[in-house]
A protein has these predicted regions:
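N-terminal beta1-alpha1 cap of cysteine-dependent amidohydrolase-like domains
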Residues: 1-84, 92-98, 103-110, 117, ...
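Active-site metal-binding loops of divalent metal-dependent hydrolases
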Residues: 49-50, 87, 142, 193
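Amide-donor transfer/coupling interface in amidating biosynthetic enzymes
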Residues: 41, 73, 104-214
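Short, flexible active-site-adjacent loop segments at beta-strand->alpha-helix junctions, enriched
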Residues: 87-88, 122
Length: 214
């Protein structure tokens, strides 16, 4: 299976993501922001970083690039899309997932390992976990605080994927740090699963997110 790895100017986790995809037994292929046709891919991962330097606001400029049309077409074909960190903000900008990710309650860059509760395992990326299972992944963001005006709808439609467990390091509403669309095939997450794919680095919980494409 071939998984596209989207690159924007300022993306800095693309190689980590490509390695994680290989560890999951899949074939990664880099795709530039200028590409529109993604139909050859079985799924897409959009790595984090600082797309276009996060000028204006995080994800704003990336949200109007040509590759976004290709991603939307892939969603129509019901192929899985995983957006990590900065891209969670982009997916919110273009309306593929609910809510927005805004500046942390403590407006500083926050980089640490966190415990997370798997709030739903109905997505391809969390299907290997049990509901309410606790996993460990790192976070690294300054604009990762989740907010929505439709929190009850998200709960009713089972669109909350991950929540901080034990502490809420950025002040996110309901400690939410990952959400999905109604189908569960499009997932936006602030934590970095690609940095937790080998026990050597402290946890391999992140590998299951990439095995979800299988």
């Amino acid at each position: 299976m071939k998984i596209g790895v989207i690159r924007f100017p300022g993306t800095n986790c693309d190689r980590d993501v490509a390695k994680a995809i290989e560890l999951a037994g899949l074939t990664p292929e880099y795709v530039w922001w200028s590409e529109e046709n993604l139909t050859d891919f079985d799924g897409i991962v959009i790595p984090g970083g600082f797309s276009y330097g996060d000028y204006l606001r995080a994800g704003a400029m990336a949200s109007i690039t040509p590759v976004i049309d290709g991603i939307k077409e892939l969603v129509k074909e019901e192929k899985p899309v995983l957006g990590i960190c900065n891209v969670a903000q982009i997916l919110g900008e273009i309306g593929l997932v609910p809510g927005i990710f805004i500046t942390n309650e403590n407006p500083k860059f926050n980089c640490e390992w966190v415990d997370l509760k798997v709030s739903t395992n109905r997505t391809p990326f969390t299907k290997a976990f049990k509901n309410n299972q606790i996993i460990a992944l790192p976070i690294a963001h300054a604009e990762g605080r989740f907010y929505t005006e439709d929190i009850d709808l998200l709960k009713d439609q089972d669109q909350i994927v991950l929540q901080f467990e034990g502490k809420n390091p950025n002040g996110s509403m309901e400690a939410i740090t990952s959400v999905c669309d109604e189908s569960g095939l499009v997932c936006a997450m602030m934590p970095h699963p690609e940095r937790a794919c080998e026990e050597l680095f402290g946890s391999d919980d992140g590998l299951n997110f990439f095995k979800g494409f299988l």
